[in-house]
């Protein structure tokens, strides 16, 4: 009985898949718990340790390295797991730093919200000068250009705006 080439390809894929499953099962049975423990000693988080174990297995199956003996295989698997663990630690540090920075920025914005609310209640000329100077970071000469005023007028608006803002904050928020 002759098989079609397509059927033969399916058979080869099934045999290849079964071989990979057997190989994966052998690696998990032999090294799974030890790799999980190693990863956990690095990351101190079972979920991350399980991810590292899974990624180690995937790397093994992708590369399918040939070893001189079982000790070489074990060393390779542990080296990959250790490197993945170190990468995870570095990634987590970066992610935590980014989250902390985002939290600090949000907190800073919340802390200054009441100040900007008070600025909104200032007369328009003071509000414009204060906004452009403090929020946008323009120097007084550039603010004068933007608003079509003399630089001395902008400086006066800033000074008067600060005085008025100080009054508003003292009245509303008991600032001294």
Regions found by a protein language model. Give the residues of each.
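Internal acidic/polar
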Residues: 87, 94-120, 139
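A short pre-motif secondary-structure segment
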Residues: 129-133
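A short, charge-rich alpha-helical start-of-domain segment used by transcription regulators
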Residues: 3, 12-37, 50
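Arg/Lys-rich amphipathic alpha helix in sigma70-family domain 2
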Residues: 68, 78-98, 108, 160
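DNA-recognition helix of helix-turn-helix
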Residues: 82, 147-171
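Amphipathic, Lys/Arg- and hydrophobic-enriched alpha-helical face
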Residues: 27-46, 63, 119
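Structural recognition of an alpha-helix C-terminal capping motif at a helix-to-coil junction
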Residues: 37, 51-58, 71-83
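Sigma70-family region 2
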Residues: 44, 55-72, 91-92
């Amino acid at each position: 009985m002759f098989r079609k080439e397509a059927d033969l390809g399916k058979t080869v894929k099934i045999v290849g898949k079964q071989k990979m499953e057997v190989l994966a099962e052998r690696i998990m049975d032999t090294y799974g718990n030890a790799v999980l423990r190693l990863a956990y000693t690095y990351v101190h988080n079972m979920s991350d340790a399980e991810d590292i174990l899974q990624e180690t297995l995937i790397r093994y199956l992708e590369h399918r390295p040939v070893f001189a003996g079982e000790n070489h295989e074990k060393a390779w698997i542990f080296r990959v797991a250790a490197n993945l663990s170190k990468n995870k630690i570095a990634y987590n540090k970066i992610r935590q730093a980014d989250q902390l920075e985002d939290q600090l920025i949000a907190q800073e914005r919340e802390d200054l919200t009441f100040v900007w609310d008070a600025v909104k209640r200032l007369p328009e000329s003071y509000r414009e000068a204060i906004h452009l100077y403090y929020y946008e970071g323009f120097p007084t000469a550039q603010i004068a250009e933007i608003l079509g005023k003399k630089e001395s007028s902008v400086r006066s608006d800033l000074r008067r705006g600060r005085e008025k803002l100080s009054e508003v904050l003292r009245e509303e928020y008991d600032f001294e």
